[in-house]
A protein has these predicted regions:
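Alpha-helical cap/lid subdomain in secreted, periplasmic
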Residues: 31, 93-94, 98, 114-250
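Active-site metal-binding loops of divalent metal-dependent hydrolases
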Residues: 83, 104, 135
């Protein structure tokens, strides 16, 4: 072999070695990248499952507590609804009837609250039921008006088996605040206004009473959705005023 041929061979071998090293490094980086993506996906999935598990666990615990509460009161006024109801602070009673806050975080018109409540009551008399639902239908689910009406109508039919006095509360407006952008508010308020326009006639058809919400200050929430102290001042008044018709019939 000539000297030049030997030198060329050595150079080629060195170049091949460097290319092999680069290829190996690229493959390692690719593997690391895929591993990071996989870990990220698993972490996101675990976080979602964990949050869902916590939410389900909270609801189950709360439903058990409500079972205990409703089993020891007679002829109560029950407020059913979502986290807006659950976070509310209402008087303990109204004209001699215990007020039971039966709000469940995340509840909507598809949560089958009627079946759950009828089962818990097990035939016990109820003075009145106030229903406050619709925010979660408008936000996460983005249900159409026909879907919302059908779900709400079915719920009222179930609740009417427990009492002749069912009060349907209007859905509170949302603010453009924090994570709730102006575009998100506009889209959600379109559905909320549509729902609210359907509730008076829907209540009448179902033998229920519609309770409107007076105008709220701006802002009236702490995060765009959940009510602030100022928001609850208006909301509480509407709930109590709607249920107070019961007091005149005693």
């Amino acid at each position: 072999m000539a000297l030049s041929d030997g030198f060329s061979f050595l150079c080629s071998d060195a170049i091949f070695g460097r290319r092999t090293q680069h290829l190996s490094a690229d493959m390692n980086r690719t593997r690391i990248g895929l591993a990071v993506l996989l870990i990220g996906a698993v972490a996101v999935g675990f976080s979602y499952v964990r949050k869902q598990s916590i939410s389900d666990s909270h609801r189950q615990t709360r439903q058990i507590i409500l079972y205990y509460t409703l089993s020891r009161v007679d002829n109560p006024i029950i407020i059913v609804g979502d986290s807006i109801v659950e976070a509310s602070i209402l008087p303990r009673e109204l004209c001699g009837h215990a007020i039971v806050n039966a709000g469940l975080d995340g509840a909507s018109t598809t949560s089958d609250l009627g079946t759950w409540l009828i089962d818990v009551l097990d035939g016990k008399p109820v003075a009145a039921i106030v229903v406050s639902l619709g925010t979660n239908d408008a936000l996460g689910a983005a249900r159409s008006r026909p879907q919302f009406e059908a779900n709400y109508r079915a719920l009222l039919a179930q609740l009417s088996k427990a009492t002749a006095r069912v009060i349907v509360l209007a859905i509170p407006a949302i603010d453009a605040l924090r994570r709730m952008t102006s575009d998100m508010q506009t889209e959600a308020m379109g559905r909320i206004n549509d729902y609210n326009s359907a509730l008076p006639e829907l209540s009448k058809e179902s033998g229920a009473t519609f309770a409107a919400l007076p105008p709220m200050p701006t802002p009236h929430t702490i995060d765009g959705v959940h009510l602030s102290a100022a928001g609850y001042q208006v909301w509480n008044q509407a709930v109590l005023q709607g249920a107070s018709a019961l007091c005149g019939s005693k």
